[in-house]
Every structure is written in structure tokens, then in C-alpha cells.
Amino acid sequence: MSLHSPLPRAFYAADARTVAPLLLNKVLVSADGRRGRITEVEAYCGSEDAAAHSFRGMTPRTQVMFGAPGHLYVYFIYGMHWAINAVCGGAPGHAVLIRALEPLAGCDAMHAARGAAPFKSLTTGPGRLAQAFGVSAVDNGLDLTTGVARLWIEDDGTPPPAAPLAGPRIGIRKAVELPWRWVVPGSAYLSRPLPRVSGARASVTGD
């Protein structure tokens, strides 16, 4: 895989719990130059995950989640914000929610999209980062892997954390005990600090 190019479809082909911590420190890029390092993610796992939109099977809303990995699943939350997810493989209905970014470039454009938001809150939260990157319903189903879409995720050479911190997901009412949220240790760019959980580290199974 070359630097500064979209992650290939094979990167997303695994279970969302495998892909999620590997997305940490990757860079979300827009064609107009906005760039942000991924600092916080959550995995959602289809029929085995009551918190996933895809838990009860495919609907018109969740159709993208049941398609090829490497596509963007975009949905509306709280009646006011968009959120972005990378569709994964492994099993039907898997996706990784991108919860927070560290802004790297194109910050003027992010500020223009977000208004007078302080720098540290430009992209700390799924709705905030989607707004900062101008994401809306038209981006649902966008292919992150082609290099011709307006958004993609790339590897700039910064490896994922060797021991990403894991904890319960945020803003859900079901499956609240599952530690399927991962963050970059020590990052100042999180939607919410991670509660200390003894021995919590990245896990393929979520145990």
C-alpha cells in the first residue's frame, strides 16, 4: 500500500471489531484539502449487536451496510446531525462509526462549515466532524476506495496505536456493556474521555 492513497477495499473486509482499532491514526481526507487524523471509533456488528442499525436485517436505510466493504454509510442522528461510518466485511451489516478526528489541514474550511467552533471541538464528535467535512445524505454509499470520490481514508505512515484503549460505546441504549469503542491513548481530540477500564485494550471478539 502506497502512502497518500485511499485504503484498499481489502482493508475493510474484516469484522468491524478488527477494522475499528486499525482505523485509529488513519486520515480522513476530502478532495478540497480537509484532513483529519482518526482518534476515536466504534464498531457496530450486525445481527449480533442490538445497538446496530443493521441488527434486524436490511432496510432501505441500512442497505449500504449490507453491500461491499469500503463504502460510506451516512445517517441522520438526533434530528440535526449526520454521522459517517465505514462499511466492513466479516459478516453482513458491520460498520465502524468515526467519532472524532484531530484536524490536520483545511482548518479554515472546517471553521467555515462549523461556524465559530473552538479548534479542539471542530471535529470531536460524529456530528461535528461530518459537518466540518461537509458530509450529508448525498454521501451515503460513497466508495472510499476508488480515489475518485470526494472523500477517502488514507495511511500517511503513522501506525495505529500498539495498545489502543477500549471502552463502552456512547449514546446507545442497547448492548451498552460491550467495549467496542477505541481511542488513541493520550489524544486531546476525543468526543468524550474514555472511562478507565482495567485491562481494556483492543479485542477482536470484544470480550
UniProtKB/Swiss-Prot annotation:
Single GO MF descriptor: alkylbase DNA N-glycosylase activity
InterPro entries linked to this entry: Formyl_transferase-like_C_sf, MPG, MPG_sf
Known EC number: 3.2.2.-
Broadest EC class assigned to this enzyme: hydrolase
Alphabetical list of CDD domains matching this protein: AAG
Keywords associated with the record: DNA damage, DNA repair, Hydrolase
One Pfam family per UniProt: Pur_DNA_glyco
Keyword Hydrolase: yes
Signal sequence annotation: none
SUPFAM superfamilies: FMT C-terminal domain-like
Biological process, per Gene Ontology: base-excision repair
Family stated for the protein in its record: Belongs to the DNA glycosylase MPG family.
Name under which the protein is recorded: Putative 3-methyladenine DNA glycosylase
Organism encoding this protein: Xanthomonas campestris pv. campestris (strain ATCC 33913 / DSM 3586 / NCPPB 528 / LMG 568 / P 25)
Organism lineage: Bacteria, Pseudomonadati, Pseudomonadota, Gammaproteobacteria, Lysobacterales
